[in-house]
C-alpha cells in the first residue's frame, strides 16, 4: 500500500511537471522557426540556403519540439496511470499506444536535429555526397504533408487520437479539470478521424492538411492545462 501511494505521488508529480514543461516549450516554439519562411511554398534552393544560414536556430527549434513531445507523453502516461485504477486493461493499452506515438515522433525529430542540417551543409558546400543529399533533403521536407518526414509526424498524431479515444470516457470524473480534459480528448480523437476520412475522400487539399490537422491538436494544449490543475490538486491532497 505504501509503495502504491508513493508511486501515485511520483506519477502525479511527473504529470504536473511535464504539463508545465509543455506550456513552456509551447511559448518558446512561438519564437523559433521550424522551417524556412514560406514553409510549404518555399522553394528547395531557398530552404537549403535558409537551413545553412540558420543551422543553430533550426536545431534549437526541433530540440524544443523533442522536449515538448516527451513532456506531453509524460502527461499522457500519467493520464493512463490514472484511468488504470478502475480500468487496468484500458490503461495498459493506452500506455502502449502512447509509447508507440513516442517512437513515431522521435524518428523524424531526431532526423531534424541530426540529418537535415548535415544534408543542407553538404548541398551548400558541394562536397562528396551532395548528389545524394539533395534528393534526401527533398524527401525529408518538414512542411510538405506527403514527405517521408511529415508522414511519421502525422502517424504520431493519429496514435495520439487513438489514445484520446481510449482514455476520454474513463477519465471523466467529478472534478472540472477531468471533465474538460475528457471532453477535449474525445473531441480531438473524433475530429482527427473525421479529418482523416475527409483526406482519404479527397476533400482536403495538400496545402490545407497542416492547418486542418495541427489545428485540431490545439485541443491537446487544453487537456495539458486542465490536467496540470488536476495533478497539482492530487499532489496537494496527498500532502494532507
Task: Please annotate each region the language model reported.
Residues 2-240:
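Hydrophobic, aromatic-enriched alpha-helical segments typical of multi-pass transmembrane helices
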Amino acid at each position: 500500500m505504501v509503495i502504491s501511494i508513493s508511486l501515485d505521488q511520483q506519477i502525479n508529480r511527473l504529470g504536473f511537471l511535464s504539463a508545465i514543461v509543455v506550456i513552456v516549450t509551447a511559448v518558446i516554439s512561438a519564437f523559433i522557426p521550424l522551417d524556412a519562411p514560406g514553409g510549404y511554398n518555399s522553394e528547395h534552393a531557398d530552404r537549403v540556403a535558409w537551413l545553412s544560414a540558420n543551422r543553430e536556430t533550426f536545431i534549437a527549434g526541433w530540440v524544443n519540439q523533442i522536449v515538448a513531445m516527451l513532456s506531453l507523453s509524460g502527461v499522457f502516461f500519467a493520464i493512463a496511470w490514472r484511468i488504470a485504477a478502475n480500468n487496468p486493461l484500458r490503461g495498459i493499452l493506452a500506455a502502449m499506444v502512447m509509447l508507440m506515438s513516442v517512437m513515431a515522433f522521435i524518428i523524424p525529430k531526431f532526423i531534424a536535429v541530426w540529418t537535415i542540417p548535415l544534408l543542407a551543409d553538404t548541398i551548400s558546400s558541394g562536397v562528396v555526397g551532395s548528389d545524394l543529399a539533395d534528393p534526401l533533403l527533398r524527401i525529408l521536407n518538414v512542411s510538405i504533408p506527403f514527405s517521408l518526414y511529415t508522414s511519421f509526424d502525422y502517424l504520431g498524431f493519429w496514435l495520439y487520437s487513438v489514445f484520446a479515444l481510449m482514455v476520454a470516457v474513463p477519465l471523466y470524473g467529478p472534478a472540472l479539470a477531468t471533465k474538460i480534459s475528457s471532453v477535449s480528448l474525445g473531441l480531438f480523437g473524433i475530429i482527427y478521424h473525421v479529418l482523416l476520412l475527409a483526406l482519404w475522400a479527397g476533400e482536403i487539399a495538400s496545402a490545407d492538411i497542416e492547418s486542418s490537422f495541427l489545428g485540431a491538436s490545439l485541443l491537446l494544449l487544453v487537456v495539458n492545462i486542465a490536467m496540470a490543475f488536476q495533478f497539482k490538486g492530487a499532489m496537494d491532497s496527498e500532502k494532507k
